[in-house]
Amino acid sequence: KPEEIVLLRRWIDDGANAPADEPVPQGPSEHWAFKTPNRTPLPADAGNPIDALLEKSRGKLGLKAQPAAERTILIRRLYLDLIGLPPTREQLEDTRPWKSIVDELLASPQHGERWARHWMDVWRYSDWYGLGKQLRNSQKHIWRWRDWIVESLNADKGFDRMIEAMLAADELAPDDTDTLRASGFLARNYYLFNRTTWLDSTIEHTAKAFVGLTLNCAKCHDHKYDPITQEDYYRFRAIFEPHQVRLDPVPGETDFEKDGLPRVFDDDLDAPTYLHLRGNPKDPDKTRLIEPGVPAILASFAPAIKPVKLPPYAYAPASRDYVMEDRLLDIRAEVQKA
């Protein structure tokens, strides 16, 4: 505002006086979020660790915990939390031990369905759209990724293993078509008309979903608040630069309009990445290549990069035995019609 500019100029003209002992704010890299977490010690007589930590904070504030809710209220909360459905009258009157009810709900298929909805919001699950048969965004048959999420949660698969599969199933499990469904996370970002828009979406939502950072803010310049440089952004892009999407045949079906496995694969390992000056894809700095890597602030957490040898059908899915058998059946059917 003009009046604020006047105040700043007046302050400068007066000598720009400031408190001599004014503390200098810590750099962004000193924020607790970028530090290795330490386990908080719990009292020896602690029951539930969450309750123990809450009680410690309540004590500092002079607060007291509310008494436990009655059992029917707790059962109702439990059902809504774990499976997203209210209990029946009979279930409200269940007298079994609390742990038995919890274990039963955790083992029910509705548990994975209920919690998959929340994670699919974070991971941006979306069916494909286009014009006619033209695919413009996401992928056909992306429901296979949705089913993998539900099944993984119901199988109590570790969150770390789920992330690894969504980002690198094509390299970690090239033989396992069930696990390959996980790469729908990356395939969902597909955008027909602009490769940079496609990769920008991949970078932004991978960082938001898995490291809680707005890496997209560093596309045009260094991040204003987080310790992320513009070069960090393009190093992260270089990780995804080689990848493409495709539909692989599934057993028993050769028509991709009816069914298929949407997935990613490395199409061009030599695809170069350049820093876009001011974020403009029409103005790449071709004086130097950007090597793949995570933001420098996270480098200590990054695993060592190792080459992976893939089977031939990872590049040529039509060479799988079941694909050739299905196509042979199609040909025989056509011959019979003739």
Segments from the language model and where they lie:
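Aromatic- and Gly/Pro-enriched helix-to-coil junctions and flexible linker segments
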Residues: K1-D170, H223, H243-A338
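Sequence context surrounding c-type heme c attachment/ligation sites in exported
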Residues: K1-P2, E171-L269, P307-A314
